Amino acid sequence: MQLPYSEELNIEYLGRLFDNTTECYKFFWFKAIVTKVTAGKYELTYEELVDEMIADAYFMVTEYHLNLGPKDALEGIVNLIRIKNPALKSCEKQSVIIDFLKNTQDKEIISKKRALTYNVPYRLQSPFMENVKGKEWNVGESRLIAKINQENRLIYYFEALNGLSTKIIVQSDWAQYIIKNQEIIKGWLEYKMITYIQKRNPSVPGIADKLYPPYERNLERVKKYWRLILSLEPVHEIYGDNILTENDLSIDHFVPWSYVAHDEMWNLNPTTKSINSSKSNNLPDWNTYFEKLVRQEYQSYQMLWKYDAVHKEFDKCAKEHINNDDIRYRIYRKGLEFTEFAGELETIILPVYQSAKNCGFTNWKYQNVR
């Protein structure tokens, strides 16, 4: 992706910010700068940028279980926050995370926030500083700041070192360039992040959907399909064996959406609102629930070929929720016996399930607390 040309600024150096990146800090640091600059702030403290970095990484680690790097301190501080504050949800709003980080008095968290600033504020702009090489980077922060502040035409410069209160000053010409071209710059940054994170998580699908907090998904078409089925035959949900009703119907992703990042019908099953909330983004125990899932799905499969109205509703659903013709043929074609249907569904779901399990999604069994 090509960044917009500028006669005044060296865009070639900007385009090299993430060359040879082995850890994720540069992406999150620059993303935080872009966020602040486009909001009209040019003087930024280390602390507000670090808080933004942690909030941006939070849901990637807690909700999506992404690996951000081999020794990633950003991932480590997110995990520490969850351990010390279990009340924080995995899909917590970024504003809540930032407020927590601003107000925390926890010495360990503050220390780890400071540790995030030891290198990235200085190293990010290394493409602009071709004269600074090798061991010249390995000096104290104050000396490094003095050296960097002598360089010409950087994106930002530093005020005196003062821990997390240290300020960077984004230069006005760079700020105007970022604001003017913010959509292209954000797209370029997103592309670079996707490439990096995909390399760290080669078996994880839908990385592009996991750079941002989870969004509200539209499963109304699937709900309508199951409501029609419920009006024709009783259906038991698979976790608590309750008979489903139209008034208490929720659509669950068997393998969590936060892993698969899609709404394909073969991974969707009807349950109750409270059970779906309880399950959250955990993995249902395979030995306990997969056969029940098969029986429920096979019931709907049989009705698909028994009732014209169900078939018609299924076809409407399939336009949005079955995006693979091979899978549609394998598990929805006419004439499948139960064992054949079960075998096909297992070959589709099990590899995805195992991959999610390997990424750290928690095994779950429903506990009826009545």
What do these predicted regions represent?
Residues 1-222, 287-303, 370:
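Mixed-charge, low-complexity interaction segments
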Residues 7-10, 26, 230-233, 247-250, ...:
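Active-site-proximal structural scaffolding
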Residues 15-23, 230, 258-262:
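Short, charged/polar micro-motifs that form catalytic or ligand-binding hotspots
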Residues 34, 38-41, 58, 230, ...:
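Hydrophobic/aromatic-lined pockets within catalytic cores
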Residues 214-225, 251-257:
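Short Cys/His-rich Zn2+-coordinating modules
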Residues 221-250, 272:
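Short cysteine-rich loop/turn motifs with clustered Cys
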Residues 241-270, 279-292:
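Histidine-centered nuclease catalytic patch
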Residues 289-366:
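C-terminal structured domain segments
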